[in-house]
Every structure is written in C-alpha cells, then in structure tokens.
Amino acid sequence: MRAAGHRSSRAHANAHAAAHAAAHAAANTTAWVLGALLLLFLAVPIILLVALGAGGVGNALRDPDTIAALETTFVTATGATLIAAICGSPIAYALSRASFRGRSVIAAIVDLPLLIPHPVAGIAILLLVSRDTAFGSALLDMGFRVVGTPAGIIAAMLFVSAPLYISAAREAFARVDRRFEFVARTLGDTPWAAFRRVTLPLARRGLASAAIVTWARAVSEFGAVVVLAYNPKVVSVLSYDRFTTGGLGQALPIAATLVLVSIVPLIALRALKYDRNSEVVS
Amino acid sequence: MIECRDVNARVGNFAIRAVTFVVPQGVHAALTGPTASGKTTLLELIAGAIAPRSGIVRVGGIDVTGRPPETRGIGFVPQHGYLFPHLNTSENVRYGARDPATVASLTRRFGIEHLMDRTVTKLSGGERQVVALCRSLAPRPDVVLLDEPFAALDADRRATVLNEFSALQVEWGFTVLHVTHDESDARSATLRLVMSDGSIT
C-alpha cells in the first residue's frame, strides 16, 4: 500500500515535470515566434523596397535632382558628424570618466533630443534662428542664413544625431581602462598628452563606429530637416517630395538609393564592431 | 625618499587609515600583507592616482600631496604591467624616456632587445612585466613603485631580473617600494613594511 502510494506520487511528480517541460517548450516557441515576427516586420519592407526600387537606381543616379540631393546629403551629414565628433568627444570623455557636479544635468541635456519628435526639434531650432531672437537677428545681420540653406540642414542633422555620437563615444571611452592613462601620467604625460597618446588611440574603433552611426542617422534625417530647409533638398526630402507629387513609383527609386547608401555605413560599422570584439583593450 | 605622514584615504568601501612610514633615499623596501589590505591603493596614492583625505605624501623630501602624477618623479609598475596595447615593445619602453642611451642600456641589461619589434599583446606574462619595468625606469625616476612585478616570472628569470634591478638601484640611487607576496623578494629588500586592513603595522 505504502509502496503503491510512493509509486503513484513519483508518477505524479514525473507527470508534473513533463507538464512543466512542455509549458517551458511552449513558452520558448512562443517567444521565438514573436521575435521572428518582429524581425520580419523590420527586414521585409526594406528588402521589398530595395528589390522593387533597385531597377530604378541606375536611372535615379542619372537624374540631376537626385545627384544634387545625394551631394547635399553627404556634405551636410559629414559636416554634422564632424561637428558632433569635435564638440561631442570632450563631453563623452567627461561623462565616461569623472563624477562631477552637473553631470546628470549634462546627461539629461544630451538625451533630450532623443525624446522629442523631430519636426518639433526643427521648429525649436527655427525659433532660435528666426529674426525674432537676438541670436537669429545677429546671424542674419552677419549675412548668415540658416533657414533654407545647407547650414540649416546641418543644424537639424546635428540636433538629432549628436546625442547618438555622445552616447556611443562615451561607451568607447569607458571601455579604456583608466590605469593606462594613469601609467602614461607617471611616465610624464599631462592629462591632455595621456588622452592624445593613449586614450584616443585605444578608443579609436569605438569612436569610428560612433561617427558612422551619427553619419547614418544624419543621412536619414527627415523631420527636423524638412522644417528648416525644404530646399536645397536632401535625399529624404526629395523622396518625400516625389512621393507627394508623383506617387510611389516616383519615390521608390530614390528611396531605394537612400537605403543602399545608408546600408553601406552600417555594414562598415558591423565590420568594425566584430574587429573590436577580438581586440585586447585591458 | 618616500614619506607618508598620517595619510587617510577612501576608495569606494575601502580605507587607508593613518598610514605613516619613511623609506630613506636609495633603500629597497618590501610592502607585504594579506590580499585587499590596501597595498595597491597605497602605491596609487603615492603615485598620485588617488588624493588622500588628509595627511602628507613626500617624495625626495618634497611635499607632493596635491601635485599631478607627472611631476612626482615616480616610476610605477602596476600589476599585470598595463603595457599600451596599441604600441610595440620599443614604443612602450621609449614612452617616457628622455634619452635613447638609457633605453638601449635598459633593454640590454634586462635582456629584452629581441622583443623590441614585437606586438606587446603577443608577449608572455613574464616578458610583459620586464618590459613594464624597463618602461618605468626609462625616465630615470627618483622613486620606483612596484606592484608584484615579478609574479609571472619563473624562478631563474626572477633571480636574474631582481639582481639586475638591485645593481641598477645602486648605480642610479633610486628608492623602491615593492609590493610582493613572494618571501624571497621580500628578503632581498632592506626594509620591510607590513600592511593590514588599511594600516601599516
């Protein structure tokens, strides 16, 4: 009787374990399916766009408007990336190293542009540079126009992409062990010399990948750019313009061109990332 | 000369308490004590990586307490060497050197001439430590702080390197504070400091 009871309780435990394993497997499968659906949703429209639009890329590249838009986009995105790198690196470095007064305020300011809609960012910059403000009228008095110029495009791109640079560069600096800097200091380096001779070279791959993300973000910016400069047209504005005037067929080749152009830096970025994983930094 | 007078410091949860000691000019002092007793923290404090909360640090008789590391005349060999991975062996040794003759003599004496063109990430643990030692000596420091610099060397190599180091110390006259767990290293020192729970006992 006791033995039978023992057996039945063991059978019960086994059944329980099996049910548990089945539930676990079901949960696992569900998680995979949900993840796969999202991945498909992210990838398929882009693949479709390139597949259907690729045939028109050749023609698009013979269209002077597209060529001009590509040129404007690359020049302004490169300008925005350079400004983000030059002005953003010191901020990124400070955030990665020191705990100082106002650190959280700086971090919040840096995150701010990520939280507001991009057209709103454009409107905010428009307010700053309009002739109604002292700053805007001073710029205009000096003959420096922002609205409707490459400078406006750069300003819009910088506003939305600089935070990405700062956060990626901050990670790149944080990965460099501070002891390297300290050893350089004991070997006679000033803080700046140690940064230039040790920290910067050790962070260079991370900084390069930060710059690529920034550039790709600047190239694909639409909302803030369109508010500040409908003309000269960047590629994203041109594709929107063609879409509203000529429909999907007109917009598709340009959209495909833009995607192909933004895929190139992303592939370069992946390559850098894989490289970095094998690199010894500590 | 290295002098700490009533030095207190706090790094994270870890404290250095009322540390007072003197290592006279040209003396090789061993600093021993259990793991996590504050030995490395004390070296970093003397070298200037950490500022004390109170107390005075003197190097060569000069108060360096508030001074940046690059003005202290201290050579520092951290545990594991911390060779700059983006530079080769030669560039590492030359990093803070004032003249090429010193570099040439150091590399010859410590037997690392054949490693000069190598990538430092490809060196063995022992080779890295010797390179790090040479790099710290190249600027001709007044004081050398060593954090278990010979731990990765086999016994033979260890004895050779230690002999060469002692000979160089007599010639150049620098002062040494040497953190070690090795009893034979500690015996080769002329002064012995023992640290426990953040204090010199």
Language-model-detected regions and their locations in the chain:
Chain A
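C-terminal transmembrane helix and the adjacent membrane-cytosol boundary/short C-terminal tail
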Residues: 2-8, 26-32, 37-48, 102, ...
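Membrane-interfacial helix termini and adjacent extracytoplasmic/periplasmic loops
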Residues: 4-5, 67, 122-158, 192, ...
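Periplasmic/extracellular loop-to-transmembrane helix junction in inner-membrane transport proteins
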Residues: 5-10, 23-29, 47-82, 94-103, ...
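Alpha-helical transmembrane segments of multi-pass integral membrane proteins
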Residues: 34-37, 44, 76-81, 92, ...
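Faces of alpha-helical transmembrane segments in polytopic inner-membrane proteins
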Residues: 41-44, 87, 109-119, 143-170, ...
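Transmembrane-helix boundary motif in ABC transporter permease subunits
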Residues: 59, 79-110, 123, 127, ...
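Membrane-helix interface segments
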Residues: 98-106, 134-135, 149, 179, ...
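Glycine-rich helix-loop "coupling/hinge" segments at transmembrane-helix boundaries
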Residues: 127, 222-248
